[in-house]
């Protein structure tokens, strides 16, 4: 069956759709198909994941149109053209093989400098200034993997970002680490009646991380701590859930991970310890961020190189929000 979302080739990033462009296409589709979707909210959601990258917009909409994943659970949630439907389409898209992602992977293999820049951006949260004379950053822009925002290089969209994280984390070297093996061993204990127990995920991660890497120096905590948490998390949610990084809050001290799992959402702030005052500000920032996501519970994982730190997991109430704090 021909789909209105079929397109033959990818577009350049400078041809990106706006949220209103996407809404216009959805209005035309809705006039024909009458799905009952909330056009404005679905258009905004698709834009949030794709930043308007035309191939990704079209591919997501095609997955939704085909409804190949229209399980009973999604029917109860109101159909595929809903937030859970879009999240499931995103999960399928991120895990599929297509020419766009193959090109992205091949470019990383062909250009080591490009790979290094993207790794620093993703895992270390470095602020990389765009310099047209720098081969690696200029190449990243030319290929459409990143865009320029206020003079800095940022990954072009959430879908690219998650796919890139997965590419880095799926390398043989990463999958031979002890923390990854621990996740594979633990993964069946975290889901109860379809619900992901994020507190237990943090508790087990803290135990493993302290045992494996507790004697590492400050540089390790700053550069590799967040990488190892994502490496631990990924096999636990793989096949059912998805994650992405909130690029607006990512820097060298802080990374916010958003996890979608069976209709539930979790916000986990990963941060490098910078003292009590900075930590308390971080708690308040996370509480405010939970308000934005309409969540009552959030999670914080601090990588603390202080030898006198108190390792473990505890709960703390900030206003009306409950924070689950883990320290390694």
Stretches found by the model and what they are:
Residues 235-263:
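Active-site metal-binding core of divalent-cation-utilizing nuclease and nuclease-like domains
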Residues 279-283, 290-318:
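Nucleic-acid nuclease catalytic cores
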Residues 201-244:
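Acidic-basic catalytic patches of nuclease active cores, encompassing PD-(D/E)XK
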Residues 10-11, 18-143, 149-150, 179-183, ...:
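Winged-helix-like regulatory helical subdomains adjacent to P-loop NTPase cores
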Residues 97-98, 160-193:
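Short, amphipathic alpha-helical interaction segments positioned at domain boundaries
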Residues 229, 257-259, 263-274, 289:
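Conserved catalytic cores of phosphodiester-cleaving nucleases, focusing on short active-site segments
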């Amino acid at each position: 069956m021909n789909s209105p979302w079929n397109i033959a080739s990818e577009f350049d990033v400078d041809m990106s759709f706006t949220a209103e462009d996407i809404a216009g296409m959805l209005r035309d589709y809705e006039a024909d198909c009458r799905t009952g979707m909330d056009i404005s909210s679905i258009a905004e959601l698709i834009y949030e994941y794709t930043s308007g990258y035309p191939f990704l917009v079209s591919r997501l909409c095609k997955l939704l149109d085909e409804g190949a994943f229209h399980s009973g659970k999604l029917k109860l949630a109101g159909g595929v053209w809903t937030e859970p439907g879009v999240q499931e389409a995103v999960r399928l898209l991120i895990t599929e093989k297509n020419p766009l992602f193959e090109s992205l992977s091949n470019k990383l293999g062909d250009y080591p400098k490009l790979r290094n820049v993207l790794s620093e951006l993703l895992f270390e949260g470095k602020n990389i200034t765009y310099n047209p004379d720098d081969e690696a950053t200029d190449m990243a822009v030319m290929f459409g993997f990143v865009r320029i925002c206020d003079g800095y290089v940022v990954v072009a969209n959430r879908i690219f970002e998650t796919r890139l994280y997965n590419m880095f984390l799926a390398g043989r070297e990463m999958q031979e680490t002890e923390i990854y093996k621990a996740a594979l061993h633990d993964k069946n204990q975290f889901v109860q009646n379809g619900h992901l127990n994020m507190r237990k995920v943090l508790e087990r991660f803290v135990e493993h991380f302290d045992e494996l890497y507790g004697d590492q120096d400050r540089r390790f905590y700053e550069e590799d701590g967040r990488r190892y948490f994502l490496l631990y998390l990924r096999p636990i949610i793989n096949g059912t859930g998805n994650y992405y990084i909130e690029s607006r809050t990512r820097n060298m001290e802080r990374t916010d991970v958003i996890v979608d799992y069976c209709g539930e959402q979790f916000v986990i702030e990963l941060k490098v310890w910078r003292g009590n005052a900075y930590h308390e500000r971080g708690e308040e920032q996370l509480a405010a961020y939970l308000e934005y996501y309409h969540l009552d519970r959030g999670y914080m994982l601090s990588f603390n190189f202080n030898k006198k730190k108190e390792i473990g997991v505890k709960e703390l109430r900030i206003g009306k929000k409950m924070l689950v704090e883990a320290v390694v």
